[in-house]
C-alpha cells in the first residue's frame, strides 16, 4: 500500500467531488465542529479544505509523509504528524473535536472501524465531538452503473459507483479491481472524454489504481453506526444534495460518557 498514497498525493489536483470535499461538505463540517467551540482540533489526514477552515489549534495526522509533504501548509496553530489513525500519536483526552473526510473507507470493516472508535474515544476530552464524512454503500450492479452512464455527472462519481458495485458482501474491494472494472465497462476512454467533456487526465488518473494492494470499504450508514457504538454516540447526520450526496453523509458523534 506504500506506493498508492504517494501517487494519490501527486495527483490530488485531479481528484474531484465526491471523493474530495466540496463547499457544501466543508460548510456542514464547519457547522458541526463549531458546536464544540474547540481549542484543539484533530484533522484525520491532510485534506487541505478541512485544514484551511477548521477552528482551533489544528493537529493533522496522516500515515504517509508524502501526503503531508504534498498537501500540508504549516501555519501558526497548525501542525502535522506522521502517524496511524488506529494508534494516534496524541495524549489521552487532548482533543476537543476530531474531523475527517472519507477516511474511514481505508479501514477493514468491521474490526478496524471498532478500533478507530476506541482510539478516538481515547484522545477526545469528555463530551468531545467526532465529525466524519462517510462513503456509504447503496446496492447496485455494474449493469445498473452501465445503464446510468449517460446521466453520471463526473468521473469521480462514476469511479465510486463502480467501486461500490463490485465490493464484496464483506464490504471490501481491492483498489486495482476498481480500475479493471472501469476498463471493462468503458473500453474507449477517448470516446468517454469526448461524450462527457471530462478531462482525459482526470480519467487516466484511475491508472494509479493499477496493481495497488490497497483496499477500500463501503459499509452502509447503519453498519457504521453500529460498529462505532458504544464508544461514540450519534448526535446527528447530515446528507448533502449534490450527486451521490446520499452516499456521502456527515455523521456527528460524541464521546460516550464514562
Predicted segments with their positions:
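Class I SAM-dependent methyltransferase SAM/SAH-binding core
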Residues: 40-88
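Core SAM-dependent methyltransferase catalytic element
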Residues: 229-258
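A short glycine-rich, Lys/Arg-flanked "PGG" loop and its adjoining helix->strand segment in the class I
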Residues: 114-129
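Short alpha-helix
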Residues: 213-231
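A short SAM/SAH-binding and catalytic strip from SAM-dependent methyltransferases
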Residues: 96-112
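Conserved class I S-adenosyl-L-methionine
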Residues: 1-36, 129-171, 185
Amino acid at each position: 500500500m506504500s506506493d498508492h498514497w504517494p501517487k494519490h498525493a501527486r495527483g490530488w489536483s485531479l481528484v474531484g467531488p465526491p471523493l474530495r470535499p466540496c463547499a457544501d461538505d466543508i460548510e456542514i463540517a464547519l457547522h458541526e465542529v463549531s458546536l464544540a467551540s474547540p481549542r484543539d482540533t484533530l484533522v484525520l489526514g491532510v485534506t487541505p479544505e478541512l485544514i484551511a477552515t477548521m477552528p482551533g489549534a489544528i493537529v493533522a495526522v496522516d500515515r504517509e509523509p508524502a501526503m503531508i509533504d504534498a498537501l500540508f501548509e504549516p501555519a501558526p496553530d497548525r501542525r502535522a504528524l506522521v502517524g496511524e489513525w488506529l494508534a494516534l500519536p496524541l495524549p489521552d483526552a487532548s482533543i476537543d473535536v476530531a474531523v475527517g473526510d472519507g477516511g474511514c473507507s481505508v479501514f477493514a470493516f468491521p474490526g478496524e472501524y471498532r478500533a478507530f472508535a476506541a482510539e478516538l474515544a481515547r484522545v477526545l476530552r469528555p463530551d468531545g465531538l467526532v465529525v466524519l464524512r462517510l462513503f456509504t454503500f447503496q446496492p447496485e450492479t455494474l449493469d445498473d452503473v452501465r445503464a446510468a452512464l449517460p446521466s453520471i455527472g463526473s468521473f469521480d462519481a462514476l469511479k465510486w459507483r463502480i467501486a461500490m458495485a463490485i465490493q464484496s458482501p464483506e464490504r471490501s474491494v481491492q483498489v486495482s479491481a476498481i480500475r479493471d472494472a472501469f476498463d471493462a465497462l468503458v473500453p474507449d476512454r477517448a470516446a468517454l472524454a469526448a461524450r462527457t467533456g471530462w478531462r482525459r487526465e482526470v480519467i487516466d488518473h484511475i491508472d494509479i489504481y493499477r496493481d495497488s494492494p490497497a483496499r477500500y470499504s463501503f459499509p452502509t450508514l447503519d453498519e457504521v453506526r453500529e460498529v462505532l457504538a458504544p464508544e461514540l454516540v450519534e448526535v446527528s447526520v447530515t446528507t448533502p444534495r449534490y450527486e451521490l450526496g446520499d452516499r456521502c453523509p456527515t455523521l456527528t458523534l460524541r464521546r460516550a460518557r464514562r
